[in-house]
Amino acid sequence: MTDQIRRAARSVGANISEAWGKRRYEAHFISKLTDADGENHEVEHWLITARRDGYLTDAEFTTLLEQKREVGRMLGSMIHKPESFHLK
């Protein structure tokens, strides 16, 4: 399960990096950020599973889930205001 959480979390960063490299193309930028958001949601799934199966305490789960949600808020802001990130 650790591998799945790590893979999904790393994929969030990889997709953001790819989006940044293509930021001059709004549709591609949004698409890659949307992929990152999907991976971020997968992280939540694995966190819920880890807590359910006893691999995380409630405190650990709460901390990690809040961090995941903060990443989601940042991604949402970037997706909804892509013009703020375009090359001029």
Label the model's feature ranges.
Residues M1-K88:
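Amphipathic alpha-helical assembly/interaction segments
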